[in-house]
UniProtKB/Swiss-Prot annotation:
Name listed for the protein in its UniProt record: Large ribosomal subunit protein uL2
Positions with biased composition (Low complexity): 39-48
Chain positions with N6-acetyllysine modification: K242
Annotated source species: Shigella dysenteriae serotype 1 (strain Sd197)
Function of the molecule: One of the primary rRNA binding proteins. Required for association of the 30S and 50S subunits to form the 70S ribosome, for tRNA binding and peptide bond formation. It has been suggested to have peptidyltransferase activity; this is somewhat controversial. Makes several contacts with the 16S rRNA in the 70S ribosome.
Keywords on record: Acetylation, Ribonucleoprotein, Ribosomal protein, RNA-binding, rRNA-binding
Complex formation: Part of the 50S ribosomal subunit. Forms a bridge to the 30S subunit in the 70S ribosome.
GO MF terms, alphabetically ordered: rRNA binding; structural constituent of ribosome; transferase activity
Taxonomic placement: Bacteria, Pseudomonadati, Pseudomonadota, Gammaproteobacteria, Enterobacterales
One CC-aspect GO term: cytosol
Coiled coil, from the record: none
Family of this protein: Belongs to the universal ribosomal protein uL2 family.
Disulfide bond annotation, renumbered to this chain: none
Name of the gene this protein is made from: rplB
């Protein structure tokens, strides 16, 4: 896998950096694990915009990814690695010994032909999934559950991982990439290793059109709007002189947004960035 800078054959190609992975499958995805994925355009069921800057983009099929990894005791072989347009990480198509196929997140170093397994008896190697009470302290893991049996929710993006720093009875303490340290039940599952495709962060789209292909619409500055459209709008010239806020008047810098007090007790240390 490598980051390749394109030749400047046009203004739109001049700054493009692509991530090339020759190990990815070049054919079609596995059809039984595909679902229709309708675009919302950022609108809710009333047709009102609830998330700005979303719309258009190429049609995509959703790949049904197994985040629970609950097929215990049955070994599986990695058939191939695939691109997934719905996430930054690549996915792997695995064939279980009983004939079932599933998609999983592709960890760093996983390749076609490798064997993986889930359950308490699985070996300690990248790609295997175990309850965190059975994983050595100090290990890096990904696809981490926050409730037993719910499926992985933490560390699913390309290049991410979580480190197990302590185990205390029914809980393990995790260090997240943000710097936050939090407790999770020791029976929650996690997959060993870090998510692959870490070079994703080196990608440069190079032109506005590449963002539009991905369904991302332009972001207009508040100072460029009229007073009716934004609190920063209006004025002669480029005067600002206010605390920056959202279009609805909520502070944008430093305002706390977390409201889930029920789980505050599990956070040992707040995030540092």
């Amino acid at each position: 896998m490598a980051a390749v800078k394109c030749k400047p054959t046009s203004p739109g190609r001049r700054h493009v950096v692509k991530v090339v992975n020759p190990e990815l499958h070049k054919g079609k995805p596995f059809a039984p694990l595909l679902e229709k994925n309708s675009k919302s355009g950022g609108r809710n069921n009333n047709g009102r915009i609830t998330t700005r800057h979303i719309g258009g983009g190429h049609k995509q099929a959703y790949r049904i990814v197994d985040f629970k990894r609950n097929k215990d005791g049955i070994p599986a072989v990695v058939e191939r690695l695939e691109y997934d347009p719905n996430r930054s990480a690549n996915i792997a198509l695995v064939l279980y010994k009983d004939g079932e196929r599933r998609y999983i997140l592709a960890p760093k170093g996983l390749k076609a032909g490798d064997q993986i397994q889930s359950g308490v008896d699985a070996a300690i190697k990248p790609g295997n999934t175990l309850p965190m009470r059975n994983i050595p302290v100090g290990s890096t893991v990904h696809n981490v559950e926050m409730k037993p049996g719910k499926g992985g929710q933490l560390a699913r993006s390309a290049g991410t991982y979580v480190q197990i720093v302590a185990r205390d009875g029914a809980y393990v303490t995790l260090r997240l990439r943000s710097g936050e340290m939090r407790k999770v039940e020791a029976d929650c599952r996690a997959t060993l290793g870090e998510v692959g495709n870490a070079e994703h962060m080196l990608r440069v789209l190079g032109k506005a059109g590449a963002a539009r292909w991905r369904g991302v619409r332009p972001t207009v500055r508040g100072t460029a709007m009229n007073p009716v459209d934004h609190p920063h709008g209006g004025g002669e010239g480029r005067n600002f002189g206010k605390h920056p806020v959202t279009p609805w008047g909520v502070q944008t810098k430093g305002k706390k947004t977390r409201s889930n007090k029920r789980t505050d007790k599990f956070i040992v240390r707040r995030r540092s960035k």
